[in-house]
């Protein structure tokens, strides 16, 4: 039920990256649910992970492995989150890494594991071990779309995008894939994203690039306000192109940053459009705050309000629910006489009261659209922010009520 989400575009290969998938029977029948992303030696890697205190075992292991090594393989499974599994979960993740490391002739610390799926169940290690030799054999540079499908859980469509640009007179590619549909309010930061570029970029510079991209994309979305135990976003740089970016002051860095942010934003918005049960894509704009933090407070309070989200689902211009969300957002000393509210281009509230020219018909017209913008002006500063969310439908309840059955 993706809200205005188009079919997966053609994903461009990234020199130095090969990908493969296999049906390991982790939770799903007759569909790939295990994937690896192999990266050439000498590549660099940046990553951000969930800040959920109950982070999953693969997050713990991936952080450890990434601390002192450049990874050669990403190992990803769908259907089992390996979260809430204690020490055994960590042992299981390490065991799977060791199996792939033996196949690849690398140290187990050169493997980064990632999992998504049901929380609280032990990883079926033997099934993964049995399937790894098969996935190893089918890796290819064109496997991006296959991996995008293999890592899906409640997603209804695979998500991926590519950007190709010229820098220093040479071509550069950035390709990324992601999964996510529910339990979405990333704080990097169930959401996983994997990006790669063929530019040559030192790890610290790559980390800065990813952090900026994530801040303007994945950390600006919410489906249901729940932050997963398994959130992770990875950016690989293979150095296989002729473009080398040594510092953030390098003129080429700005071009790479723009491309990475574009890919991140496309993936993040695709996750929202594929939000569990989503029928509408909602942009919440808050301007006129004293700082970004209070703009975020207001935006997220609106975006995560069940009453606002169900009003959007019903195409009901119930602006009182939005005002209530603004009022309870916790902005200190908020003067309501400075607040204005817009549904699309229609001004509903001006100076804290109903605009005399607003009509219910205007509101219904806006709320009936597939893409809705809710805009708030606080009238107390110059800060502004955008958050993206979706509506809350009957299907969301059904999907999550039946998730483990």
UniProtKB/Swiss-Prot annotation:
Q: Look up the domain of life of the source.
A: Bacteria
Keyword annotations of the record: Acyltransferase, Amino-acid biosynthesis, Arginine biosynthesis, Autocatalytic cleavage, Cytoplasm, Multifunctional enzyme, Transferase
Q: What is its EC number?
A: 2.3.1.35, 2.3.1.1
Show the catalytic activity: N(2)-acetyl-L-ornithine + L-glutamate = N-acetyl-L-glutamate + L-ornithine; L-glutamate + acetyl-CoA = N-acetyl-L-glutamate + CoA + H(+)
Q: Where in the cell is it found?
A: Cytoplasm
Provide the GO biological process annotations.
Answer: L-arginine biosynthetic process; ornithine biosynthetic process
| Chain positions of site Involved in the stabilization of negative charge on the oxyanion by the formation of the oxyanion hole | 116-117
InterPro entries to which the protein is assigned, alphabetical: Arg_biosynth_ArgJ, ArgJ-like_dom_sf, ArgJ_beta_C
Query: Under which pathway is this protein filed?
Result: Amino-acid biosynthesis; L-arginine biosynthesis; L-ornithine and N-acetyl-L-glutamate from L-glutamate and N(2)-acetyl-L-ornithine (cyclic): step 1/1; Amino-acid biosynthesis; L-arginine biosynthesis; N(2)-acetyl-L-ornithine from L-glutamate: step 1/4
Q: Which GO terms describe its molecular function?
A: glutamate N-acetyltransferase activity; L-glutamate N-acetyltransferase activity
User: Site positions for Cleavage, renumbered to this chain?
Assistant: 189-190
Q: Where does substrate bind?
A: 153, 179, 190, 276, 400, 405
| Hydrolase listed as a keyword | no
A GO term from the CC aspect: cytoplasm
Q: Where is the active site?
A: 190
NCBIfam families, from UniProt? ArgJ (TIGR00120), PRK05388.1 (NF003802)
Read off the PANTHER family from this record: ARGININE BIOSYNTHESIS BIFUNCTIONAL PROTEIN ARGJ, ARGININE BIOSYNTHESIS BIFUNCTIONAL PROTEIN ARGJ, MITOCHONDRIAL
Q: Which family does the similarity line name?
A: Belongs to the ArgJ family.
**Role this protein plays:** Catalyzes two activities which are involved in the cyclic version of arginine biosynthesis: the synthesis of N-acetylglutamate from glutamate and acetyl-CoA as the acetyl donor, and of ornithine by transacetylation between N(2)-acetylornithine and glutamate.
Q: How does it assemble?
A: Heterotetramer of two alpha and two beta chains.
Q: Which HAMAP family match?
A: ArgJ
**Protein known as:** Arginine biosynthesis bifunctional protein ArgJ
- What is the source species? Nitrosococcus oceani (strain ATCC 19707 / BCRC 17464 / JCM 30415 / NCIMB 11848 / C-107)
Gene field:
argJ
